[in-house]
Design a protein with these regions (language model features):
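Generic detection of short hydrophobic beta-strand segments and adjacent strand-loop junctions
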Residues: 50-53, 92, 122
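Cytosol-/stroma-facing membrane-proximal "stalk/adaptor" domains immediately downstream
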Residues: 98-145
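Phosphoinositide-binding peripheral membrane targeting modules
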Residues: 72-107
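Anionic N-terminal interaction surfaces
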Residues: 2-72
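Short charge-dense sequence patches
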Residues: 43-50, 79-87, 126-127
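A structural detector for beta-sheet-dominated domains
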Residues: 69-71, 78, 93-95, 113-115, ...
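Generic signal for short, ordered secondary-structure residues
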Residues: 54, 76-77, 111
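Short, surface-exposed coil-to-beta transition loops
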Residues: 62-65, 87, 109
């Protein structure tokens, strides 16, 4: 094997190893792992979806890489395939979710808390929370400021 081939192989191993480790750390600091303990999606999700969304969870910001989904029973969360390591799809029953609107000077957001992982904060844009509310057949509502 030539030295160039060895360098390419080592680079690939290091790159994919670092990517794997980074995603595991991200799932830990965001709280995704904690949510997955109780809310990992058992099957394919049936409902409305918004793809390529940005959300904040814990100390992580999922920029245009999250999918939000809803039906009359659950909130569905997933990430794009390249980021799926350590991030199983989640289905969280609306009965376990509370949301509170927070207003700021220009844009507001809605902070979601989940019963079985109350330390995890999920921040959505108000428009995303409004979409969830409307497409959950108004089963879920957040507290407005």
């Amino acid at each position: 094997m030539e030295s160039n081939q060895i360098i390419y192989i080592l680079f690939a191993i290091i790159f994919f190893g670092a990517w794997f480790l980074l995603l595991l750390v991200l799932s830990k600091v965001s709280g995704w792992q904690k949510l997955a303990i109780s809310y990992a999606a058992p099957e394919k999700f049936l409902g409305e979806k918004l793809r390529m969304q940005s959300i904040k969870m814990g100390r992580a910001h999922y920029q245009s890489s999250a999918t939000l989904g809803t039906n009359s029973e659950v909130l569905y969360l997933s990430v794009l395939l390249p980021f799926h390591i350590g991030h199983p799809n989640l289905t969280i029953p609306y009965s376990d979710i509370s949301g509170v609107e927070h207003k700021s000077l220009f844009l507001g957001h809605v902070e979601i808390r989940v019963a079985k992982a109350s330390s995890v904060k999920i921040k959505l844009r108000k428009t995303q929370a409004d979409w969830l509310e409307a497409n959950s057949n108004n089963i879920w509502k957040y507290d407005r400021a």
